[in-house]
Curated annotation (Swiss-Prot):
InterPro entries, per database record: ADH-like_C (IPR013149), ADH-like_N (IPR013154), GroES-like_sf (IPR011032), NAD(P)-bd_dom_sf (IPR036291), PKS_ER (IPR020843), Trans-enoyl_RdTase-like (IPR047122)
CDD domains assigned to the protein according to its UniProt record, in alphabetical order: enoyl_reductase_like (cd08249)
Function summary: Trans-enoyl reductase; part of the gene clusters that mediate the biosynthesis of the host-selective toxins (HSTs) ACT-toxins responsible for brown spot of tangerine disease by the tangerine pathotype which affects tangerines and mandarins. ACT-toxins consist of three moieties, 9,10-epoxy-8-hydroxy-9-methyl-decatrienoic acid (EDA), valine and a polyketide. ACT-toxin I is toxic to both citrus and pear; toxin II the 5''-deoxy derivative of ACT-toxin I, is highly toxic to pear and slightly toxic to citrus.
Entry coiled-coil feature ranges: none
Enzyme Commission number(s): 1.-.-.-
Miscellaneous remark of the record: Gene clusters encoding host-selective toxins (HSTs) are localized on conditionally dispensable chromosomes (CDCs), also called supernumerary chromosomes, where they are present in multiple copies. The CDCs are not essential for saprophytic growth but controls host-selective pathogenicity. Although conventional disruption of ACTT2 could not be accomplished due to the high number of the copies identified in the genome, the high sequence identity among these copies of ACTT2 is likely an advantage for RNA silencing, because it allows knockdown of all copies of this gene simultaneously.
Residues annotated as binding substrate: 128-135, 268-272
Protein name: Trans-enoyl reductase ACTTS2
Repeat recorded as keyword: no
Subunit structure: Monomer.
One of the record's GO molecular function terms: oxidoreductase activity, acting on NAD(P)H
Length: 343
């Protein structure tokens, strides 16, 4: 029996590296020999939160080399291809899912084939970000997909722009022809301006929202909030123009501050076309859109139109990931995405 090493949830807050069977390849899936994985805030929240499921494998972001391709995969992938993709980390319904493993089985159409110019470490940062940007900006906000650009003069606020998802959002927004306003800590201003942000504001400034509203002449109508908690609702509500607009969040917002804004909360897992919860059944529409967006993103990566997020590469492989999750949980990681090489 073929096996793999994986980071498996034991109970809420507890994980262990286990040697487990390599699952039978499903028709829409590929098997990837993992070369690197990246950590996201959602990973530690899944582990320490109420939805931690014993037996599930953590991790969403990975890169590696294709070993097998299921017969129903539409993406043009063959064994030996270098890829990066998105997995359902902590899946409560199918414990074959999850990215923190020596081998991953993942939806074959939610992948990008990589050129040799991008390292596995850099590519491992892409999975959650590409999936989320596609859902938030192009499905929820209704922006035209590149190379098409928005016809009317328009701007967008990317709140939390220095996150791995935020840096991608800034770049896609520029490719779509938007003027991009962003919030971040001051030490990340230069990075965001290099990626295309027109102006960046300190989210800790009590006047942040008012300043954005002034600079945008009260016309801001699009917001993508990558944080969706803390001070973010108050800031974007103050920044948005009098006519309201559209707002996309990654978490549900309680006590929503404005009634003239269309609010959409997205969840990346729905892009996989599988059951997420009893309230979120498999969504084929989200899957088909995400497959299309990943194909587009592969093209943009090949043309070097998209740059990856800064990484902090750590040694130790799968065994060292629990410490990284602790560091993320305790706020010890800033400005980089933690990446682990997998032997």
């Amino acid at each position: 029996m073929l096996t793999r090493r994986a980071l498996v949830v034991q109970s809420q807050g507890e994980v262990q590296v286990e040697e487990i069977p390599l699952p039978t390849l499903r028709d829409e899936y590929i098997t990837v020999k993992v070369k690197a994985v990246a950590l996201n805030p959602g990973d530690w929240k899944m582990l320490y939160g109420p939805h931690a499921t014993p037996g599930s494998i953590l991790g969403c972001d990975y890169s590696g080399v294709v070993e097998k391709v299921g017969r129903a995969v539409n993406a043009l992938l063959t064994p030996g291809d270098r890829v990066a993709g998105f997995a359902f980390g902590g899946c409560p319904y199918n414990h074959d899912e999850g990215g923190f493993a020596s081998y991953v089985t993942a939806k074959g159409d939610i992948q990008a084939k990589l050129s040799d110019s991008i390292s596995f470490e850099d590519a491992a940062t892409l999975g959650v970000g590409i999936t989320t940007v596609g859902q938030a900006m192009y499905q929820a906000l209704g922006l035209p997909l590149p190379p098409a650009i928005i016809q009317e003069a328009a701007s967008i606020l990317v709140y939390g722009a220095s996150t791995a998802t935020g840096t991608l959002a800034v770049q896609y927004a520029k490719l779509t022809g938007l003027k991009v306003f962003a919030t971040a800590s001051p030490h990340n201003f230069d990075l965001l301006k290099k990626l295309g942000a027109d102006e960046v504001f300190d989210y800790r400034d009590p006047e942040c929202g008012a300043k954005i509203r002034t600079v945008t002449n009260g016309l801001l109508s699009l917001v993508f909030d990558t944080i969706s908690e803390g001070s973010s609702p108050a800031i974007w509500a103050a920044a948005m123009g009098a006519k309201g607009g559209k707002y996309t969040a990654l978490l549900p917002i309680k006590n929503f501050p404005r009634s003239d804004v269309k609010v959409t909360t997205i969840l990346g897992y729905t892009a996989l076309g599988v059951k997420v919860s009893d309230h979120l059944p498999a969504n084929q529409k989200d899957f088909e859109f995400s497959a299309k967006f990943w194909k587009l993103s592969q093209h943009l990566l090949e043309k070097e139109k998209i740059k990856t997020h800064p990484v902090g590469v750590r040694q130790g492989g799968i065994d060292a990931i629990p410490q990284g999750l602790q560091d993320l949980k305790n706020g010890r990681v800033s400005g980089v995405k933690l990446v682990y090489k997998i032997d």
